[in-house]
Structure formats: structure tokens, C-alpha cells
Amino acid sequence: MKALIVYDSTYGNTEKLAKAIAAALGAGATVVRVSEANAAAVGKAELLVAASPTTGGRPTEAMLRFLDDLPAGSLKNVKTAAVDTRLKAKWVKIFGYAAEKIASRLARNGGTAIAPPEGFFVGGTKGPLADQELERAAAWAKGIAAK
């Protein structure tokens, strides 16, 4: 499956997550930082995974811009999935998480979600990723590859 993993990362945690997902998806997977992503690459993908840290209850501005700039209907025949990195703190739930907002924008552009939005935990604002999160991300990716 031709998979494109588009990510943004502030402290490197979401980048590590994106690379773990790509490795689990196999040879057909490409990882691209959101600043280098474009609609042409998205159009060639069978699967688009968008990954962002949660910042103030939402994805980064760069990820939001990328998703909002995709041409209408550009994801019509594309399977999609949304992931984020997030804190475990209970107060964060008040603001929500990036993955849900990413998933909404992917659907708005015609994408077919093949998994619910997924969050992966970091130990603090700057990380690191919590224990076993990279392994959990790999297992998650193998699960969506089977769909």
C-alpha cells in the first residue's frame, strides 16, 4: 500500500512516532514533514496518516494550514487516519486533542477514515514519548494496514 505519513513535530516526539508508523507500514510508506507536503503527493497515496502534537487542544498551525489548503474532495479515494502526541493530564481533556480535529478535516476533504483518531502519550510538554508508545504505534499501524 502506498502510504504517506505527513507530520509536524515541535520537540521531535511526533517525528519519531511518524517514522515508527512508516516502518510498520513497510516499503510503500513515505514520511514527509508537513512543511514539505503537497497535494500532488497526497493524491498519489492510498493511505494518508496525519500526525501532529497537540498544542492548546489542536494541531499545529502548519498542520491546520496544510489540511485546510488541500483541494476540496482531494481525499475522495484515500484512506485516512489521524494521530497526535498528547499529555496524560486530565485537565488537557477540557481543550481536546489534535487527532480529532485532524480527522474532521480529513473527512471534510472526502477521506475515508479507517481508524478512530489515536493519541500517543508524552511524559511532558517536551517529551519524551511515554514507555512503549513507539511499539504501540507500530502495532496500531499494522492494524490499519490490514484494513
Regions found by a protein language model. Give the residues of each.
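Acidic, amphipathic alpha-helical patches
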Residues: 38
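Local sequence-structure signature of Cys/Sec-based thiol-disulfide redox active-site neighborhoods
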Residues: 7
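Donor nucleotide-sugar binding loop of glycosyltransferases
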Residues: 10
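FMN-binding flavodoxin-like domain, especially the glycine-rich phosphate-binding loop
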Residues: 3-4, 13-16, 22-34, 44-147
